[in-house]
C-alpha cells in the first residue's frame, strides 16, 4: 500500500492488476485501485475535484481531472473515512500514477491533498537494471 498525509487528510492506495480485463496480446493492461481517504483533522472537508498524472513505461503521459470521484463529492467529517475503487488501462505492462484531490474545508478554505505515487506493474514483469 501507498500512503500520503496532507493537512491531516490521509490517502491510502492499493493497486491491483485486473488480469480478466487485460489482453497483453492486444497491448491492453488494466489495473484497479482502492483508495481510502481518512479525515484526521478537526474540521469537515469535501472532496471537490481530482487530478491524475499517469505515465506508462514508455514515458507517455495522460492527465485526467474532473469533479469528485466516481460521480460523488463526498463530505468527510472529522474521523470519517471514504473508500472507493476505480481503474486505469494502459498500453504498456507497467506505469506510475500520482495526483491530488482539491478539498474544501467547512469554512470555505480550499487546499490540495496529495495522492501518493504508486506503481502499476503486471504480474511476472521482469525488470533489468543497468
UniProtKB/Swiss-Prot annotation:
<dbReference type="InterPro" id="IPR023065">
    <property type="entry name" value="Uncharacterised_ApaG"/>
</dbReference>
<protein>
    <recommendedName>
        <fullName>Protein ApaG</fullName>
    </recommendedName>
</protein>
<dbReference type="InterPro" id="IPR007474">
    <property type="entry name" value="ApaG_domain"/>
</dbReference>
<dbReference type="InterPro" id="IPR036767">
    <property type="entry name" value="ApaG_sf"/>
</dbReference>
<dbReference type="Pfam" id="PF04379">
    <property type="entry name" value="DUF525"/>
</dbReference>
<feature type="domain" description="ApaG">
    <location>
        <begin position="3"/>
        <end position="127"/>
    </location>
</feature>
<dbReference type="InterPro" id="IPR050718">
    <property type="entry name" value="ApaG-like"/>
</dbReference>
